[in-house]
From Swiss-Prot:
Gene3D superfamilies: 1.20.1250.10. It comes from the Eukaryota. This is Prolactin. Pituitary gland. Its main location: secreted. Keywords: Disulfide bond, Hormone, Secreted, Signal. Disulfide bonds join C71-C185, C202-C212. GO terms for biological process: positive regulation of cell population proliferation; positive regulation of receptor signaling pathway via JAK-STAT; response to nutrient levels. One of its GO terms (cellular component) is extracellular space. GO terms for molecular function: hormone activity. The gene is prl. It is found in: Secreted.
Length: 212
């Protein structure tokens, strides 16, 4: 663990969490799921905070265009609620979580690059939070990979969800609308990821379904 203390101090909170996840090969399943749930909770909270920042200036336009069926992850067949998630085998549910998270690697990179020059009065805050969100997602992805090995989840079971856009538009309105829409899709998916990880944590702890 000593090497992690020498990590750069940029995004300190994220770095500490990442270091914790790196050295987890000998940690039991319950602890791994606890740590993954903590990361997913922070990730969802941060995406909610980012959405609120955008809405402070742009809710009237951005809100009208949010159609979940237009999100690039909408084709992934996932449980609609907790009861459905509880009926899915653990390995399959973890594969769904990993597939959903992996699908956001390129979109989050695009959001991070666009945030630096986004025409919004809260640009500095949005830029900082977007980079933190990307760091959280990368850390969670590393943790889920270790969870997959622990639970015997095969990489072949992961679904590929391509993202085919490399910009958010040329004019300011288009950039704001598309940034808002993409972030809204991520917020929706981050809630699912967080919920499914909590279901997995409940299963591992042998908790009663009504307590999950």
């Amino acid at each position: 663990m000593a090497r992690c203390c020498k990590c750069p101090r940029l995004h300190l909170a994220v770095t500490v969490l990442a270091c914790v996840l790196v050295f987890t090969e000998g940690v039991n399943l319950n602890d791994l799921l606890d740590r993954a749930s903590q990361l997913s909770d922070k990730m969802h909270s941060l995406s909610t905070s980012l959405t609120n920042d955008l809405d402070s200036h742009f809710s009237s336009v951005g809100g009208k265009l949010m159609r979940p069926s237009m999100c690039h992850t909408s084709s992934l067949q996932i449980p609609n609620d907790k009861d459905q998630a509880l009926s899915v085998p653990e390995g399959e549910l973890l594969s769904l979580v990993r597939s959903l998270l992996m699908a956001w690697s390129d979109p989050l990179a695009l959001l991070s690059s666009e945030a630096t020059s986004l025409p919004h009065p809260e640009r500095n805050s949005i830029n900082t939070k977007t980079r933190e969100l990307q760091d959280h997602t990368n850390s969670l992805g590393a943790g889920l990979e270790r969870l997959g090995r622990k639970m015997g989840s095969s990489p072949e079971s992961l679904s590929s969800l391509p993202f085919n856009s490399n910009d958010l538009g040329q004019d300011n309105i288009s950039r704001l609308v598309n940034f808002h829409f993409l972030l809204s899709c991520f917020r929706r998916d981050s809630h699912k990821i967080d919920s499914f990880l909590k279901v997995l944590r409940c299963d591992a702890a042998k908790m009663l379904p009504e307590m999950c």
